[in-house]
Design a protein with these regions (language model features):
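Active-site-proximal alpha-helical scaffold in enzymes
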Residues: 77-108
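Conserved "HGTGT" condensation-loop signature of ketosynthase/thiolase-family condensing enzymes
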Residues: 1-73, 92-95, 107-118
Length: 118
């Protein structure tokens, strides 16, 4: 098993964003992490995107916005632990030698979720 290092991080501010889709918020966080790492986006070999309520393909929509196309993007869902699960998957893929550079992100915008209750 190989050592794994975090090269960069990015986030959005916490708050209510009813007019911004989750993939737009995720794009900012992903781009900030890539800039913080000091790497070119095409160096990323695989990405894992954790989410719960954003529907199919949110990882692909998020990363297409910053030019990441052609690399595998795996959407993972684990309720409140979805972002952590995406990080674990990225760590595992590097630790076991499948990839050298992976991106892990969690994408959600609960301001846009309609209430399903009474």
């Amino acid at each position: 098993m190989r050592d794994v290092y975090i090269l960069g991080v990015g986030t959005t501010t916490c708050g209510k964003f009813p007019d911004k889709p989750a993939h737009i918020l995720g794009r900012k966080a992903a781009w900030d992490a890539i800039k913080d790492a000091g790497i070119h986006p095409r160096k990323i070999e695989i990405a894992f995107c954790g989410h719960v309520y954003q529907g199919m393909g949110v990882g692909q929509r998020t990363l297409k916005e910053i030019g990441l196309v052609g690399q595998p993007v795996v959407n993972v869902e684990g309720a409140c632990g979805s972002g952590t699960l995406s990080f674990w998957e990225a760590w595992r893929s590097i630790a076991y030698g499948q990839y050298d550079i992976a991106l892990a992100l969690g994408v959600e915008n609960l301001s846009r979720i309609l209430s399903g209750g009474p």
